[in-house]
């Protein structure tokens, strides 16, 4: 299976001011978005997989492009949010079940519904408490309950340093038309 737009690229866009295709599984640097792990879990069933994707507050975005509805659920791996808020998230897995832990407290165990194609390898967790930050751990288990994979995201601390270096090639133009 191949999907032309699986990686973001410069060129075709969805109206100004967008300069490229961004409804993909990989960003321009080939860094995977959380949805890429859904594809990995489906096409590499022999390698146990679990990966957390936090639903962005902005939600989903879909576009009608060449008479095909495309788009993606805006997911990220960020666990820095407003204290006391709740977030929904997905775990992408090819394991039998996933247990979700927030700061060490179990949010429950859900089984991977492999009988329904639209739900296979995707487990949805609604209104997960953020609290005051900390960590979220997804533990994938086989049918016997043995751990086969694990993924963890955590709240980042305050930045300690930022370094910026100017990059000023002579052919760049600040006219709104340059891709840089």
Predicted regions and their residues:
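Substrate-binding clefts and catalytic carboxylate motifs of secreted carbohydrate-active enzymes
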Residues: 1-173
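Short, solvent-exposed loop/turn segments enriched in Ser/Thr/Gly
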Residues: 175-179
């Amino acid at each position: 299976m191949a999907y032309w737009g699986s990686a973001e690229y410069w060129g075709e866009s969805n109206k100004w001011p967008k300069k490229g295709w961004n409804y993909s599984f990989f960003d321009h640097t080939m860094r995977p978005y959380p949805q890429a792990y859904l594809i990995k879990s489906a096409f590499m069933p022999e390698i146990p997989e679990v990966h957390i994707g936090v639903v962005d507050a902005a939600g989903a975005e879909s576009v009608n492009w060449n008479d095909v509805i495309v788009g993606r659920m805006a997911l990220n791996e960020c666990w820095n949010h407003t204290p006391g808020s709740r977030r929904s998230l997905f775990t992408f897995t090819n394991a039998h079940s996933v247990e979700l832990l927030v700061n060490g407290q179990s949010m429950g165990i859900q089984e991977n519904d492999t009988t329904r194609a639209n739900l296979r390898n995707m487990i949805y967790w609604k209104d997960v408490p953020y609290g005051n930050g900390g960590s979220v751990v997804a533990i994938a288990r086989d049918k016997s309950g043995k751990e086969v994979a694990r993924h963890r995201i955590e709240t980042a601390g305050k930045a300690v340093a930022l370094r910026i270096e100017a990059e000023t090639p002579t052919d760049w133009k600040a006219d709104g038309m340059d891709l840089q």
